[in-house]
């Protein structure tokens, strides 16, 4: 007998992450992604069931991972060629002079939080997304806009076809 959608157990809102501290100590656990960047600390549930609160200024990156057993840091930290996914192609320079590239959504409101979420260059690696607190960054540069729709020549001119001509023949 099929189970209706309202009787089904809700999908887990906790995602697997590895929190990398500024001193390069990794901490594995689960977080609720919607709270990242909105609070002064990260609430982490460890695999042992222990609750930890990690202050955001001590965090370098939060890696959303597929598995805890495989390496969490991307094999490649920069794109080998122009990315194919839509978004802003950015280069991040951390306070410890480490450099990483990634893609952020093409919505500037996403960049106003206390951190930024990027898609790493290694799409087939263990890290699906990376959250970087603003306090861990020294610099963030936009290298390009990928997938933006080109404006037509009529939009560039701003001339409407229904607009009357000044001198008609």
What positions do the PLM features span?
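Conserved RNA-binding domains used in RNP assembly and mRNA/RNA metabolism
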Residues: 1-169
């Amino acid at each position: 007998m099929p189970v209706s959608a309202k009787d089904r157990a809700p999908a887990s809102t906790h995602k697997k992450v590895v929190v990398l501290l500024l001193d390069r100590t990794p901490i594995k656990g689960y977080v609720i992604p919607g709270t990242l960047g909105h609070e002064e600390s990260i609430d982490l549930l460890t695999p042992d069931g222990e609750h930890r609160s990690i202050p955001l200024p001590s965090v370098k990156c939060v890696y959303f991972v597929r598995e805890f057993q495989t390496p969490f840091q991307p094999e490649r930290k920069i794109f080998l060629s122009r990315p194919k996914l839509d978004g802003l192609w950015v280069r991040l320079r951390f306070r410890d002079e480490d450099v990483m590239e990634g893609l952020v959504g093409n919505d500037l409101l996403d960049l106003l939080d206390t951190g930024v979420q990027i898609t790493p260059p290694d799409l087939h690696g263990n890290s699906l997304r990376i959250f970087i607190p603003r306090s861990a960054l020294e610099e963030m540069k936009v290298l390009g806009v990928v997938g933006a729709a080109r404006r037509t020549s009529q939009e560039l001119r701003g001339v409407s076809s229904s607009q009357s001509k000044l001198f008609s023949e």
